[in-house]
Amino acid sequence: ERELTVMLLVDVSASRNFGAVGEAKREMMAEVAATIAFSAIQNNDKIGMIFFSDKIEKFIPPKKGRKHILYIIRELIDFQPESTGTNISLALEYMTNAIKKRCTTFLISDFVDGNDYKNALSIANRRHDLVAIQVYDRRETQLPDVGLIKLQDSERGCEQWVDSSSACLLYTSD
């Protein structure tokens, strides 16, 4: 009986909505988080969760039990954030302050964040065992070669016309 504490930090910013039906990053994030949550309950661990965007959207304190896991799963599926941006540093700082006892933390995000979060990652990793899981959709960086298209930043709402014929060269030249 391990009885460890596991925390899920789940990015609920607008960029998670990218992807095809059944393949959106939000669905992948929910599947990853649910898998970790079920694994934690099998190991008799406490599980908690923080939903974050550019603010702390919801904090679910760590608890044990099947009922608690089902609540977490329901929240993963149904939760609607108030904000659209991303602030990973804020989420890590909140978790580090809220959870005093050393825990295993899974940070599940696409890591689309205009802020520098390296220092917060370093501090959180010293206090807790931190595992970062990047949810990625290759279509975000590989535009179809269709000419002029209008793109919208889902987090900031700004729009821009892009010539995808030339953008394809820039995006795929890693």
Enumerate the language-model features and the residues they cover:
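Short beta-strand-loop
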Residues: K46-E75
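Von Willebrand factor
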Residues: H68-C103, N115, V135-D137
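Conserved strand-to-helix beginnings and helix N-cap segments that scaffold or border functional pockets
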Residues: G22, Y117-K118
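Cofactor-binding loop segments of dinucleotide-utilizing enzymes, especially the Rossmann-like FAD-
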Residues: F52-D54, D110, V135-D137
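An amphipathic, basic-hydrophobic helix/alpha-beta surface used to engage anionic
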Residues: E1-E57, T104
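Short, solvent-exposed loop/turn segments at secondary-structure junctions
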Residues: R16, G114-N115
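Active-site flanking residues adjacent to catalytic metal/cofactor-binding acidic residues
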Residues: V10, S109, I133
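Von Willebrand factor type A / integrin I
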Residues: N97-C103, D113, N119-S173
